Amino acid sequence: QIKILDVGAGTGRYSVPLAEEGYDVTALELVKHNLGRLKQKSDKVKAYQGNATKLKKFGNDEFDLTLVFGPMYHLKSAEEKLAALNEAKRVTKPGGYILVAYIMNEYSVITYAIKEKHIKEGIEDGMLDESFHCTEKANDLYSFVRLEDIEALNAQAALTREKIIAAD
């Protein structure tokens, strides 16, 4: 049976349907409230509270597939993001896959700044720099990355990007 780890599982958007399809799913969620909601939705998911940067509950090479769909755009520093990738790599079996979600800078600029006509406002407010990179403030909920940021993280973690599936 395929073993899946959902890191930053939230309320179970992915882990619950995957468990219902018959996969052996383990979920890890930082926020206690979200974890409670996930547990209410399904008793088929093994759900734990924990941090994406420290997957100490799990052994090396334990999962066939590791999903990291929430943490990477909530983690602020490159060090935290690298720690999360390294931990995902550690718990994923050789030949397994790690799927990671990021919020892409360019997509956000195109949809918010250009399409919704907020370029001038974004620059004046300091949300965009002169190279149209989204700047982050300490209390921002999300962090934005460019493709070169992902490539640098992957290189540091000795991971290879197979493909980008969608922009979000």
Describe every region a protein language model picked out.
Residues K56-T66:
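A short acidic, Gly/Pro-enriched loop at the edge of an enzyme's catalytic core
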Residues L65-E79:
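A short SAM/SAH-binding and catalytic strip from SAM-dependent methyltransferases
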Residues L82-P94:
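A short glycine-rich, Lys/Arg-flanked "PGG" loop and its adjoining helix->strand segment in the class I
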